[in-house]
Amino acid sequence: MYEEQLNFLKDFANKDDFYQRIALYKELLKKFNAVHNLTHLENIDDNIIDSIKILDYCDLIDKKKIVDVGSGAGFPAIFLACILENSNFFLFEPSVKKASFLRVIKTELNLININIIKEKLQNHPPFKVDLIISRALMDIKPLIEISNGFYDEKTSFLLYKGSEVYDELQGMKDYKIFNRGFRNYCLLKVKEKLC
């Protein structure tokens, strides 16, 4: 199923490890979700594919320091971290139950390249990163505003958006959109502060 929809997996050396991690993630999510109601997602496989399909469109291997804003149940950061093993991920999730779940996932999947930060991005001391990712958290401009201090002219934003992406991008210039069905992956550069 995954290799049929994800071309980059054909050349990925650690496929078996990746598939084992997916199976364990799905098992743990099912257990946690029964008690803590973490997510209402019905098709986990589709959401995993959605999380990493961007790797068919662009190479993120040079992004060594990555922030995920509003990590929730780990989409997309957990699955990107499984593939981009030489990158360090900082998952910002203020919800106690979701941050706890992410800590379990980090341990059980042996993801030594992720760090769970149980607070909102805008409340944390900033540090510069190569990539800021977010899926379905907020509109683009407010997300850029709360990311102030975490980005510079070299930083990219990777935003998982729906059909509203073009409305949200009005007035912005340096971006690319990669489309897959309902999903628009927006790769964006911000040259200066918006406000």
Residue ranges and their predicted role:
Residues 86-90, 94-195:
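S-adenosylmethionine
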Residues 68-72:
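Conserved S-adenosyl-L-methionine
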Residues 1-2, 6-62, 67, 97-101, ...:
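Class I SAM-dependent transferase core
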Residues 52, 78, 141:
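Conserved active-site region of classical short-chain dehydrogenase/reductase
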